[in-house]
Amino acid sequence: EDNGQAIYKMVLDYGNVKVSGVDKDTYTVHAKTSTEGKRPADETAYGDKDQDRTIVRVEEKGTKVEIYFDENDGAAGTLSYLATGARNIPVDIEYTVTQNTPVKVSAMDGTDLGEDTFVYSCTNTVEDEETAKFTSVKVDNGINYQYYDAGDADSLIVWFHGNGEGDYKGSQNNVAQLLANRGTVAWATDEAQEIFGKAHVMSFQAPDTWYYAQKDGLLEKAYNEIQEVISKKGIDPKKVYVSGCSAGGYMTTRMLIKYPNLFKAAM
């Protein structure tokens, strides 16, 4: 099962004191995820949520407490799928933490400081080691893409996403193809990199849809941007691979027809 990026953990940082005596009932964590202002007001957005997260366990880590959530509680996602727009778009995330019962507090030297109740503020910043490997590249009058730099590797993998990850109304979010499923991040895993002997990764985001690639000149734009990366990164032109799913499979096929000598293999 691949439901895309999901928030499964929150870290509470208590600064210069240690806390203990916490359990999953100590806190209530409320999640609000919204695409308001990014879509028509009457558009149904299935990932817009306003609910408490289901806490499955907590772990005490000295001055920090880690709260783990049920990834299937309905509010874990960082994208929202639009019913008629047929696109996944990034949500604005707002988490609120309420402490229900006092926690035991001690100084760094172990001195007992009694019990206390804290007020919490959230950064609402998602940290993801897999997506952090990629850099957003935006191209004027071209096709935006996410890029994984594999250092001195001389191979390149090109990925074309499915229709739900295309851009929405010119927002140029350039992240839906990174977050909606593992189609992009999988190529940068240790396992995939070992198989390919290290390879750079380009994950394009369609300005709208791949289905109009010929009419919209996307084949030529993708080709030119691939050639630019080949030249800039010193990639062996005989070690360029391509893959895609759904609408991205269509785009992959169109690229193979138009540029039959560009790719070593297609998947």
Positions of PLM-derived features:
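Active-site-proximal beta-strand/loop segments in catalytic clefts of secreted hydrolases
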Residues: 159-163, 204-207, 243-247, 252, ...
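Extracellular/periplasmic catalytic domains that process cell-envelope and extracellular macromolecules
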Residues: 138, 150-153, 193-197, 235, ...
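A conserved short beta-strand
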Residues: 261-267
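Gly/Ser-rich "nucleophile elbow"/oxyanion-hole loop immediately N-terminal to the catalytic nucleophile
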Residues: 210-246, 262
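A domain-start/cap signature at the N-terminus of enzymes
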Residues: 1-9, 32-154
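Short glycine-enriched nucleophile-adjacent loop
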Residues: 249-261
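A short beta-turn/strand-edge loop motif at beta-sheet boundaries
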Residues: 16-24
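Active-site machinery of serine-nucleophile hydrolases
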Residues: 154-156, 160-221
